[in-house]
């Protein structure tokens, strides 16, 4: 998407290894993971206090697995800027190092999915058996209602997957067969 679109909402990912090492894996900044984590927290708090961002939620992922071990610590964020900005401006403000690490989240569906991904409670993350992070690991400022955001829109809430339909159909079939459920009762369960 061209950089002429302005929006308030963005998702951001920052990575410890990428911010402290060059492409050849040589150390460029000699700080520990804990120091980096505190630096990111202070940076975001400062942006919030300065009024440049209205609200945000972030979480540090340090338990994500690769085939070779654990993925380097990284942070995921959902940020509402105080004023609409182009992606390049948001990237510069939020410390994104790559176009891939800062993305638009102006649609409610994008925010719902991104907020669920913070904890790894998206269907895709759970199917991939990713570590589920606890809500107590979230860092939130500005009163962002993460539960409301996770729910998304009414349309999204009513969308169910094919496997969920299969499970429901099987359950209703068994109840009709075993308990003599009527068509009317089955419809009530469906709707």
What are these model-derived regions, one by one?
Residues 1-45, 84-191:
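Catalytic "initiation/cleavage/transfer" segments centered on a nucleophilic residue
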Residues 2, 47-48, 65-69:
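Short secondary-structure boundary/capping segments within folded domains
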Residues 45-55:
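Short secondary-structure junctions
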Residues 55-94, 118:
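Histidine-centered divalent-metal-coordination microenvironment in nucleic-acid enzymes
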């Amino acid at each position: 998407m061209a950089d002429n679109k302005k929006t308030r909402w963005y998702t951001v990912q920052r990575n410890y290894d990428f911010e402290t090492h060059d492409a050849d894996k040589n150390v460029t900044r000699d700080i520990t993971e804990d120091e980096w984590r505190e630096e990111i927290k202070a940076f975001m708090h400062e942006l919030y206090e300065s009024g440049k961002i209205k609200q945000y939620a972030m979480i540090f992922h340090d338990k994500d697995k690769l085939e070779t071990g654990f993925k380097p610590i990284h942070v995921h964020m959902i940020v509402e800027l105080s004023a609409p900005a182009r992606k390049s401006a948001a990237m510069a403000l939020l410390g994104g190092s790559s176009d891939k690490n800062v993305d638009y989240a102006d649609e409610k569906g994008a925010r719902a999915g991104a907020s669920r991904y913070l904890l790894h409670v998206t269907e895709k993350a759970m199917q991939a058996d990713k570590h589920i992070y606890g809500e107590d690991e979230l860092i939130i400022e500005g009163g962002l209602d993460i539960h409301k955001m996770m729910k998304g829109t009414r349309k999204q809430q009513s969308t169910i997957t094919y496997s969920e339909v299969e499970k429901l159909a099987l359950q209703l079939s068994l109840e009709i067969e075993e308990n003599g459920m009527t068509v009317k009762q089955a419809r009530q369960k469906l709707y």
